[in-house]
């Protein structure tokens, strides 16, 4: 049985999802970048509802919008940068991802979300494995809708 090779993509977008940049295949366009995992990608944020408690009643008034709106969720994206040019690739990826809004999707889940980078970016570990040096970096991404959607090809 052949091993399944998943692909991981990002694209610069406006907040409404309109593309403003080229699609980047992360492991092709950033030579030496290796995807590890995206923790929290399947999480759904808390639904926003309005509740009103009235002193004279044991009932509670609740307003639930027809179109659900969710709190933003955080996704931890863990990447490795390997090889001789690992710092160049790390810096090029940071230049790409740290400004504005970016859409992420992959061929494993076929789900997409729009995010911005919230917290500082720093190298978790600089490790040497055999003769191939690599950097491990965790990125904290804020999913602006609080959920993922089916990727539209």
For the regions a language model picked out, list residue spans one by one.
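Extracellular/virion structural assembly segments
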Residues: 2-153
């Amino acid at each position: 049985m052949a091993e399944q090779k998943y692909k991981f993509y990002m694209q610069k977008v406006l907040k409404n999802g309109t593309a403003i940049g080229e699609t980047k295949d992360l492991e092709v366009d950033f030579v030496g970048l290796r995807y590890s995992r995206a923790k929290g990608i399947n999480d759904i944020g808390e639904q926003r509802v309005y509740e009103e408690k009235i002193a004279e009643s044991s009932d509670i008034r609740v307003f639930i919008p027809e179109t659900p709106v969710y709190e933003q969720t955080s996704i931890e994206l863990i990447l490795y940068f390997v090889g001789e040019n690992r710092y160049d690739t790390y810096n090029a990826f940071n230049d790409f991802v740290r400004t504005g809004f970016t859409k992420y999707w992959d061929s494993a889940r076929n789900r997409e979300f729009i995010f911005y980078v919230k917290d500082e970016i720093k190298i978790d570990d600089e490790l040497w494995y055999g003769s191939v040096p690599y950097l491990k970096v965790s990125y904290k991404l804020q999913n602006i809708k609080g959920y993922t959607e089916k990727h539209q090809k």
